[in-house]
Structures are given as structure tokens and as C-alpha cells.
Amino acid sequence: MKSQIFFAVAALFLLTVRTYASKSKEQDLRDALFSAMFSADNQLNPQERECRYWLGTCSKTGDCCSHLSCSPKHGWCVWDWTFRK
């Protein structure tokens, strides 16, 4: 009887230790993700945007790819009737 109680208490202790360890790993992972998301490095180095393709939204012709121009009526990149290689 004493051995059964001892094994039950030991099993509960091991389960508690295992749960605590997994929670600590989860917290470390959460902290790492938050620091990566909110780091200032991403804000200081903006990336250059690609050109907009046919029927992509634009505000000026420079937003569109080389063979397209921005239509002032609709604000879309449309073909400018040129042929290039």
C-alpha cells in the first residue's frame, strides 16, 4: 500500500515538472517571437517595392512596370501601346 502511494506521488511530481518545463519553453518561444515582430531593425531598412502589373492599382506611372502606364481615370496600370524586348 505504501509503495502504491509513493509511486502515485512520484508520478504526480514528474508530471508537474514536465508541465512546468514545457510552459517555460513556450514562454521563451513567445518572447522570441514578440521581439522578432517588434524589433526596430525591420523599420529602419525599408524594402524597395516591385512594379505593379497589368490592372494593378497605382497613383502615378512610376508605380507601374515599364510597359504600362497609370490610367488617371481608374487608377489602374494599363498597357501604353509600346512594344519592347
Swiss-Prot record:
- Give the GO molecular function terms: ion channel inhibitor activity; sodium channel regulator activity; toxin activity
Which InterPro entries does this UniProt record tie to the protein?
Huwentoxin-1
Q: In which tissues is it expressed?
A: Expressed by the venom gland.
A GO CC term assigned to this protein in UniProt? extracellular region
Superkingdom classification of source: Eukaryota
Q: What Pfam families does the database record attribute to this sequence? A: Toxin_12
Record's signal peptide: 1-21
Q: Keywords on this record?
A: Disulfide bond, Ion channel impairing toxin, Knottin, Neurotoxin, Secreted, Signal, Toxin, Voltage-gated sodium channel impairing toxin
Q: Which family does it belong to?
A: Belongs to the neurotoxin 10 (Hwtx-1) family. 18 (Hntx-VII) subfamily.
General function of this protein: Ion channel impairing toxin that inhibits voltage-gated sodium channels. The recombinantly expressed toxin shows a weak activity against Nav1.7/SCN9A, and shifts the voltage dependence of channel activation to more depolarized potentials.
Q: What is this protein called?
A: U5-theraphotoxin-Hhn1a
What species is this protein from?
Answer: Cyriopagopus hainanus
Q: What is the lineage of its organism?
A: Eukaryota, Metazoa, Ecdysozoa, Arthropoda, Chelicerata
